[in-house]
Amino acid sequence: MSSFASFLDMWRDLDKYLSSLTIFNIQSSFMRIFLLFLFFVLFTFGVEGYVIEEINGSTGLRIHKEIKRKVYITEDALITETEKEFMVQKIENGLPRIYRVIKSSKSYMDFSKMTPLFLVSLPFLDCKQRVCVVNRGAFRPTNEYKKIRGFKARKVVVESHALGKKTTLIQWYTKEWKELVEANRLEDKFYVNFIRAIMKEKNLSEANIPLKEIQNFLKEINEKFGGVVRTQQQMPLFNTYSEVISVKKTEIPDYIYKLPEGYTKIK
């Protein structure tokens, strides 16, 4: 059942309940309408998006660590939750924002001044002196396949040269997990919107950042290869990995979507 249908059922049940009461003359239609309106104002709808649950781990010499995390995705927010904190990337009033929200102390740090670094973190984007170009060669699909979470996945080698340092990732893409494909499509839409917000804030144009080409490239990858079910990276002393364990289309709760609202800023 859709969330809107559930809300209508809740509305009808509340109306029946109010109609049955005699205290404060709630049986009067005017009073019932007033209380229903008050309920409507207080009832907060979430923003529709996707929630991806992942396992993140690292292995190496005397190292084996694994944690679970959730990733909340909308068109204008990408929020990662672990046991102790939220990492928030979002667009507020058309501008890019990055926050680290600490659960235990109900506080947050504002890293929004670092948003341009987001551009150099994208493996398919080479940026120098305020000019970025799409590097299609960074994305190298192979003919190796295997089953991950019950879905046929294809191995893709992704190379990045961010900040002059070469980094190689192994990503496994699947077209069979439809919800994951759609979630990644929405995530790509967020990336495009976030880059657009950075361009607005830094007064950059298509001559600096080829936004349309980026959008087309992400769309092409999603349509041709699907969604990323697993990512691996080999480091000198240890290896890291992340693997998707569940995907759900749902409404993102307001208390998540509006972060860091309700938390105290660390100055």
From Swiss-Prot:
GO annotation, cellular component aspect: membrane
Regions that span the bilayer: 30-52
Localization annotation: Membrane
Principal place of residence: membrane
Membrane protein topology class: Single-pass membrane protein
Keywords: Membrane, Transmembrane, Transmembrane helix
Protein name (Swiss-Prot/TrEMBL): Uncharacterized protein aq_555
